[in-house]
C-alpha cells in the first residue's frame, strides 16, 4: 500500500495512465479488426476506406508509444497486403 503522499499520487497517476492506454490499445485492435472484417466480407470500397482510417489511428497510437513503432508498421503492412489482395482478386 502506498504510504507517502508521493507514492499515493504515483499510484493515482499510474491508474489513470493505465486506463487511458488500455482505451487506446482497444482502439488500435478495433481498427485492425474492422478492416479485416471488411476484407473477409469482400467489400473492397469499405475495406479501403477503413484501412485509411486505421492507418491514421495506428500511427497516432505508435507516436504516443502505446504500441511499438515496429508493431504498428507490421500491422499496417499486413492490412495493406490484405486490402491489396482483395483488389487483385476482384
Swiss-Prot record:
Q: Which cysteines are joined by disulfide bonds?
A: none
Q: Which GO terms describe its cellular component?
A: cytosol; small ribosomal subunit
Disordered: annotated span: 1-25
Q: Which GO terms describe its molecular function?
A: small ribosomal subunit rRNA binding; structural constituent of ribosome
Which GO terms fall under biological process for this protein? Answer: translation
Supply the InterPro entries for this chain. Ribosomal_bS20, Ribosomal_bS20_sf
Top-level taxon of the source organism:
Bacteria
Please name the HAMAP family in this protein's record: Ribosomal_bS20
Query: Which family does this protein fall into?
Result: Belongs to the bacterial ribosomal protein bS20 family.
Can you say what this protein is called?
A: Small ribosomal subunit protein bS20
Provenance organism: Burkholderia cenocepacia (strain HI2424)
- Gene designation per UniProt: rpsT
